[in-house]
Amino acid sequence: MKKKPIRQGTATGPKKISKGLDFAYAFLIAAYALIAVVTPNFYTFDSNGPKFLALALLNLLSFAYLLTRKELKDRDESFFLFFRNRIGLAYLLLLVLTLLSFIKAINIYESILHFSKIFTVFTAAYMVSIILRRDERYLRLGAVVLSVWLVIDCFTLFYHITSSLIEGKGPAIFQIKSVYSNKNILAAAIFVKIPFALWLLAFEKGKLRIFGMFTLFVAFMATLFMSTRAFYVGSLVMMVSYILFVGIRYYRRNSIKRFITVTFTVIAAMAIGIGLYSATLKYLYPKNYQDLYTVGLFERFKTIAQGESLRAASWDRSFKLITENPVLGVGPGNWKIAVLKYENPVKPDYVYQYKTHNDFIEIASETGILSSILFIMIFVFAGLNFLKAFFKKDATEESYRLLFLPAFGLLAYGFDAFFNFPADRPEIGSLFAMYVGAAVAFSTIRQPAAGSAPSNVPPPESFVPRPASRVPNFLSRVPNFLSRVLNFLSRVPRPASRISVPLTILYLAILLACIAIFIVNFNSLKLQRLAKEDLMREKLAEPADMFIQGYPLFPNVSMEAEPIVVSKTRYLFRDKKYEEALALLLADHSSPYDTRPEFFIAQAYYNLGNYDSSLVYNYKVYAWKPLFFNNILNICRILEMKNRYPEAISLVETYTKQSPFKEDGYLFGAALCENGGYLDKAITLLDSGQKYLPDNAEILKQKSLLTVKAKIKPNEALYNKAQQAYVNKDYKESVKYFTEFINKEPNLTAAYELRAYCYFFLKDYKRSMADIGRVFADGGQNGGIYNLRGVNLHMLGDDVSACRDFEEAVKLGDKDAIPNFEQFCKKQ
């Protein structure tokens, strides 16, 4: 009896198997889709730690399970086909270059941890590709699962917004994070999953197509409410690309009516979404609530070039690193360490960006330009595979259907990677693995068994005569020399069995090593969270030994790039164990451009009374971080002790030129100048401060006080005599000295004011009024002087004018004026 032939795999990949799906494979696909999302924080400082650990454990489980499968055991192509595909090969070469760049690493522990993350996502893509090649229906399963989760994400967002509005509050979009670590990851998770809904809409039928349309609509609505500009642009590009795809697709079928229907539906859905969003902003959001995330779509678009200074500065510093290290970079995971060489001189504090906010640039910075090109080629090859299949003459839907999802998926991921750092976010990294796994699985043909008939459809990556195509010329030439090299390598024969065994053992060893590394990192992250929460209290409360003994060997810098030794030092400082702190700090070389260890070393030496050593390390900090004002204060404190005022004043003057809009430099500098006897310099410094900060009350106040002191200084002894006589109530003597002083310095308003009081107490009201007039002419009026003029006027019989002055004095807060106003001005 003749067996019914099973349908051969097409150019898009695996065979279509008619039997039911294998539960274990289905479970693994669903697990890869959701494992990073559902893994809890476990009270760590960075939820990425436990999520990467969970993904690594899933990789080990998957690999072990796949090795035991009979249908895979005797087929080397099941495990090695990934590496003969140009996408998989580009990814593998990226891993190899990442390993090579270890030789450039400043901090090898960070490189090990970072490589473990890269390898974990790579393995996830590898496992997904093997499973998807068994049966394309697993892709549908993954698409449905992730579309359902996309709907859950969207409705979680809508629920939080609705709850806030019902309570009469603003939506507080920034605080909404669902099961993710923050708002930005939620926004990315929504956007990067949209291609799954697009795929269901484009290629499924009936209920699944309707579900795809519904999911696409709510995802678009959620993207609007998240108010993320990068994803606004991404949504526009994705929708335009989809409409172009639909247009060409139905044009070739002569189904213009269908094209119009689909296009109208998509555009109408977007228009309705924008309308609902705008109406919510206008009618439901509280009128008195306003933030970055509660402005209209087009208003938000207008700010797309604003607020990007931090990203732009970060990218600029990254390009400097790339220029210095174009071949192998600064080492994987070392961007946050190496970039401080350029970030420190412009940062006034220790709040650093520990990510580039652009994975393409960060990869080039850390592992070289070629690595970044290989990363880009993953996206390019996936897109070209789809375009080649789609534009092929007489192309059937079956030839490009399965390539649509990875192409559009990587397009969405690319937007996130260009503006953020999804490579370090396992929730998004797992989606990348799904897309890359699908791209590899469905762009490679199975090699026929010996003696069997070859497939009648050539694999898209093999070198065959190029048929007439509608692909534009430039697209057909994109796979250049690099593509040809990868294609050549992809034709290397599969490994012999004797090589497969050691490779399998090696792969398992790396998987186990990654898990061990993530466990150690997990333990460190738990302590990092405790330390961070303790630091936010008024005083450190946790026991020092918990951190001194508890932190593992690595990582030796925190998730925020702070050397771990600094965290330990804070507790030793609290316990006044400065010698122990010095021993730890001096032995640390985890981050050579981070000056926190040197800052604490200087402080430890100071606390031990070793001021010269303290000054040496303070100057080391200053050399790298000239805008860190606390360090300048410490330097000036020691210089002042050594009576080296000119040196200290020069430091402060330099600081005020570099940070002209910071009041602390002007105020501290003025006090320092005053202490050193340089009043003229103090006033000059405050004049400069008033120029940049004209409304700063403290600068104006200090300038006024120092101006008085500068006028008094040449005749200080005489002025002090006048004041002392006034205090002793010897008003005649005080008038004598004040008059003598005024003859020498006629421009000191305070001298006229005090002499006016003396004349009043001597009952010489007219002379008192004359001096008060001078005070008012100089603009020195205050509550006290209004009250003084009032009592003079009362004594001179002008109660109407006196009451006006008493009332003004009360308004200005003069307490002595209150009884005068009550007694002489209120009607009985």
PLM segments and residue spans:
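Flexible juxtamembrane loops connecting transmembrane helices in multi-pass membrane enzymes
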Residues: Q175-I176, M238-M239, F259, I274-R317, ...
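TM-adjacent membrane-interface loops and short helices in multi-pass inner/ER membrane proteins
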Residues: N182, T303-Q306, L310-Q353, F360-L374
